[in-house]
């Protein structure tokens, strides 16, 4: 299956997910904004604000041998701002072959499962996930200081990991 023939994409794609009007749920978007602020548009890195459009991940995977996903994790049992880093292979979301599955309500982990099925051999092997612990997703623009500090830590980790200073 071929979705994109864009050869100008960076080798690394960084995708941030979240909803900035659901308080700390916007932390993935916050990280993306900070990365764009610090990096601009580097040649080898594509930075995407995915918002809540998880199924769009399918269109961002191709052409990027390395993918980094950033999102919030609710009710992790850890303090707000705690960072978890894991390979996407450790996250196995169940997918349904039901044609009535509402694509707009998919989460990115489910979208990854669909992408793996649809892309087959074109599915990137190197997908890392950064999750930032949160405990509040009420309707409110802005984030708590603890979530913001967690987001800042992820930005710094990514700048180191991507060897960008």
Task: Please annotate each region the language model reported.
Residues 1-125, 129-134, 141-152, 159-165:
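N-terminal catalytic or cofactor-binding beta/alpha core of small enzyme domains
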